[in-house]
């Protein structure tokens, strides 16, 4: 099997993956700020790094996968105040909702899922170290800031220079900062802050800035220097750039070897966002589409490419997934282990080892499905099912998927008992030699999105199309 190569944002190139410790991978991914339901952009991040950790385990690595939860933040505080509830009540509710969405999408839970509020002492310890090392200062407004000019490698991840940032970026003026680009490590508490929004420290009551949260949790749980750090493309700057400055300023060590960033979700070639009104939650999508269809829609696009969201693309994903399940129908896949020497498995592995190239891996699944359709071979069916399983797909019985209704069908289509009743009426018509009526019922069902397949022995099976 070829070596795994990962596109490293830091190097701006694909690199052969070499873990710091042989056979072990330590990976940190920036998770979700929990003040609302997860949206399609969150779904992409969740699925992408679920695929990454699944593949790392599949090729024999022992993985420690950490994905954090940001449970203290300006948006969280504002939403809790608006709702008239405590911060903990709000965040607990949306953490629960996030876990429900994850389960629906077939996301395997990370090994460790730290909440920011569980690591306040570690954050304060890192801030104090940065102050001792000359990277941090307490400003006149009580905030503790990071002095970006003190970190000579600032911009190495994003390729942005401080001079270019000062000249071209709009930076909010703040007279208390030594430099407009300095960012906050510790926010001084405000009189109007609700209960649960601040902690005691040598700098006074306050709370951590967003960037220090991930630095402290990553270093505390995985060590000062670990293998992979991931997140959405929008986090590359300033969040991940600031994480590097904080972590390396505090420890004097390289923070992370490989930086991975998944691409944006777009609607009509514009980034999905609330401000543009083209924003969809996972739950809204799952009202109309099966969760595995949504997962397949995400999986079949390379993780670094833009993902264009539309009903047309989801409908196509549903039709494509239906083709894969149809190939497995009526074939009893054997239960032997996956054969990595089989040609399709080799092509699949080569694709996944080429920076997790899921479009090519999925194309290999369709090649294999074609072979299964042609030969009805149990060993090939097993290969198809097991390779797809590495992507979190084809885990159900084919008939269960083919007969399940999408949200839209559940809302306006025929229920299973209605379909069975019409099939029984068609059988009765055929027995009475009323073939015109039997054909009419078949056509009526097809118009309703139900395809019939008459089997030897007189039985009839159905699936949604």
Swiss-Prot record:
Keywords of this entry: Aminoacyl-tRNA synthetase, ATP-binding, Cytoplasm, Ligase, Metal-binding, Nucleotide-binding, Protein biosynthesis, Zinc
Residues that, per the record, bind ATP: 274
Motif ('HIGH' region): 32-42
GO annotation terms (biological process): cysteinyl-tRNA aminoacylation
Motif ('KMSKS' region): 271-275
InterPro entries per record: Cys-tRNA-ligase, Cys-tRNA-synt_Ia_DALR, Cys-tRNA/MSH_ligase, CysS_C, Rossmann-like_a/b/a_fold, tRNA-synt_1_cat_dom, tRNAsynth_Ia_anticodon-bd
Family to which the UniProt record says this protein belongs: Belongs to the class-I aminoacyl-tRNA synthetase family.
Designated name of the protein: Cysteine--tRNA ligase
Biological source species: Burkholderia cenocepacia (strain ATCC BAA-245 / DSM 16553 / LMG 16656 / NCTC 13227 / J2315 / CF5610) (Burkholderia cepacia (strain J2315))
Gene: cysS
């Amino acid at each position: 099997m070829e070596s795994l190569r990962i596109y490293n944002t830091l190097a701006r190139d694909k690199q052969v993956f070499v873990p710091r410790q042989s056979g072990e991978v330590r990976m940190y991914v920036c998770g979700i700020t929990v003040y609302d339901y997860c949206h399609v952009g969150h779904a992409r991040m969740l699925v992408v790094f679920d695929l990454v950790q699944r593949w790392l385990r599949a090729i024999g690595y022992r993985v420690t996968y950490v994905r954090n939860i940001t449970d203290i933040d300006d948006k969280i505080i504002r939403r809790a105040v608006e709702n008239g509830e405590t911060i903990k009540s709000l965040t607990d509710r949306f953490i629960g909702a996030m876990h429900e969405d994850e389960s629906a999408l077939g996301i395997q839970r990370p090994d460790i899922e730290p909440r920011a509020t569980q690591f306040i002492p570690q954050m304060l310890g890192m801030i104090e170290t940065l102050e001792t090392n000359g990277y941090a200062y307490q400003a006149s407004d009580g905030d503790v800031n990071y002095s970006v000019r003190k970190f000579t490698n600032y911009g190495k991840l994003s390729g942005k220079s401080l001079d270019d940032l000062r000249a071209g970026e709009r930076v909010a003026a703040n007279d208390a900062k030594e430099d407009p680009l300095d960012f906050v490590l510790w926010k001084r508490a405000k009189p109007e802050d609700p209960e649960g929004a601040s902690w005691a420290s040598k700098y006074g009551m306050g709370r951590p800035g967003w960037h220090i949260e991930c630095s402290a949790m990553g270093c505390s749980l995985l060590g000062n220097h670990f293998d992979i750090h991931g997140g959405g493309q929008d986090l590359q700057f300033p969040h991940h750039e600031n994480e590097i400055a904080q972590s390396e300023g505090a420890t004097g060590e390289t923070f992370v070897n490989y930086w991975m960033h998944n691409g944006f979700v777009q609607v009509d070639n514009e980034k999905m966002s609330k401000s543009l009104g083209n924003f969809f939650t996972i739950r809204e999508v799952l009202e109309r589409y099966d969760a595995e269809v949504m997962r397949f829609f995400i999986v079949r696009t390379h993780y670094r490419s833009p993902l264009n969201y539309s009903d047309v693309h989801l409908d196509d994903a549903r039709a494509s997934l239906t083709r894969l399940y149809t190939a497995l129908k009526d074939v009893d896949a054997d239960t032997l282990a996956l054969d990595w020497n089989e040609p399709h498995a080799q092509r699949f592995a080569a694709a996944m080892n080429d920076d997790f190239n899921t479009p090519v891996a999925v194309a290999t699944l369709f090649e294999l499905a074609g072979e299964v359709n042609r030969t009805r071979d149990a060993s090939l069916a097993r290969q198809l099912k097991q390779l797809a399983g590495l992507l979190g797909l084809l885990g159900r019985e084919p008939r269960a998927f083919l007969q399940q209704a999408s949200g839209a069908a559940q809302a306006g289509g025929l229920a299973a008992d209605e379909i069975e009743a019409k099939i029984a009426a068609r059988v009765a018509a055929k027995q009475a030699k009323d073939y015109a009526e039997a054909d009419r019922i078949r056509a009526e069902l097809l118009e309703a999105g139900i395809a019939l397949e008459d089997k030897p022995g007189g039985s009839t099976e159905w699936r949604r199309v």
